[in-house]
């Protein structure tokens, strides 16, 4: 009898899983991004190899901001920037805290406080809520990072951080590549759908 089973492969962490996919399919499309401006719609493909470069740039940039071993919350609808941020943090930077995109403003603030987040990466649609939270200084967040470019001196953004990271990589900075992932160490804090600020 001929076996149709595939040979399994064991991984020790999420970084190995992602890296394996990148090495196997570097030129294959990993993401297709839909860009809409008015009635004009364009699609941009990102290969696995390009995704790896983006992870390395963002990860190195986040480390340059002093976020090693810090808690980094992320909020926003499904997007390439959300996935990029999430994976970059899981590559050994610190603890990722994904927040429900449907939370009301007060619950967003409460979740940030409860998770003790040091940084917050957010979609532009939350800019008003985030600026309000920032003004009140109720959280310990030191880095507010928008997923897109914004006109604000007080709020950072992913394109800017990726640029800083790439410059560091070009200088030979290997800190991001040398990060160790400890299997028993907390890497994610999840709030379930039933979690409230009081539970």
Predicted feature residues:
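Conserved AMP-binding/adenylate-forming core of the ANL superfamily
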Residues: 10, 27-87, 104-109, 165-168
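Solvent-exposed alpha-helix faces
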Residues: 56-60, 113-116, 197
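Structural core segment of the AMP-binding/adenylate-forming
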Residues: 91-164, 177
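Conserved S/T- and glycine-rich ATP-binding loop of Class I adenylate-forming
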Residues: 72, 89, 120, 186, ...
């Amino acid at each position: 009898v001929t076996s149709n089973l595939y040979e399994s492969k064991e991984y020790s962490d999420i970084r190995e899983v992602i890296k394996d996919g990148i090495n196997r399919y570097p030129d294959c499309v990993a993401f297709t991004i839909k860009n809409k401006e008015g009635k004009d719609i364009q699609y941009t493909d990102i290969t696995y190899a390009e995704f790896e470069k983006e992870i390395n740039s963002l990860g190195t940039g986040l480390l340059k901001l002093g976020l090693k071993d810090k808690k980094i919350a992320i909020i926003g609808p499904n997007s390439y920037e959300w996935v990029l941020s999430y994976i970059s943090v899981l590559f050994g930077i610190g603890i990722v805290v994904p927040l429900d995109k449907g939370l009301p403003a007060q619950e967003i603030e409460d979740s940030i406080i409860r998770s003790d987040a040091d940084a917050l990466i957010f979609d532009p649609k939350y800019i008003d809520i985030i600026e309000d939270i920032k003004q009140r200084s109720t959280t310990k967040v030191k880095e507010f990072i928008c997923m897109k470019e914004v006109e604000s001196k007080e709020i950072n953004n992913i394109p800017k951080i990726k640029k800083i990271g790439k410059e560091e990589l070009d200088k030979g900075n290997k800190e991001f590549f040398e990060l160790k992932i400890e299997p028993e160490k907390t890497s994610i804090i999840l709030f379930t759908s039933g979690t409230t600020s009081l539970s």
